[in-house]
Amino acid sequence: MSFQEVWEKEPMKKPRIQKVTVNFGVGEAGDRLTIGAKVIEELTGQSPVRTLAKQTNPAFGIRKKLPIGLKVTLRGKNAEEFLGNAFTAFKTSGKVLYASSFDQVGNFSFGVPEHIDFPGQKYDPSIGIYGMDVCVTFEKSGYRVKSRKVKRSHIPKKHLVTKDEAIEYIQTKFDTEVVRE
């Protein structure tokens, strides 16, 4: 029985995207970080959060707690829309998604080397080129029991998202090929 048949028969077993996290590692504070914030806000439609350096690295001119990156968490329709555009940019750059990018509970991540590969983006010399990491987290219906405050419980293993389920979902929903080594 294929995953599609199981999901038709039992809709609670169909995985869904919990969140998409977009990480911009700029590596320095200042103008480049400010411009990066505008780029990520234009791509996602949400204002980013600055990420801080965890340790000092004098070779790169980085001090502890200096803002050196940006991140945005997308959920719901915004996450699916952005992920569709990110896959388009990912394919445009000539990259492929490997099955080894998926972990055992179906989460995966990939990198988009240039933000200008996104649909509708043009190169602007004053902005430059920014790359980003896109991390996707999956869940199934009923996952709220592990995070609620009252009567918290764990998710049984048979209800966790598997690697193969996540691959099947991505291939059917976003028409993206996942290469198995």
Swiss-Prot record:
Looking up Pfam families in the UniProt record yields: Ribosomal_L5, Ribosomal_L5_C
This protein's GO CC annotations: ribonucleoprotein complex; ribosome
Q: Which domain of life is it from?
A: Archaea
Biological process (GO) annotations held by this record are: translation
Which keywords fit this entry according to its UniProt record? Answer: Ribonucleoprotein, Ribosomal protein, RNA-binding, rRNA-binding, tRNA-binding
The question of whether Cytoplasm is a record keyword is answered with: no
Q: Which SUPFAM superfamilies match?
A: RL5-like (SSF55282)
The entry assigns this protein to a family as follows: Belongs to the universal ribosomal protein uL5 family.
Tell me, how does this one assemble?
A: Part of the 50S ribosomal subunit; contacts the 5S rRNA and probably tRNA. Forms a bridge to the 30S subunit in the 70S ribosome.
Q: What is this protein called?
A: Large ribosomal subunit protein uL5
Source species, please? Methanococcus maripaludis (strain C6 / ATCC BAA-1332)
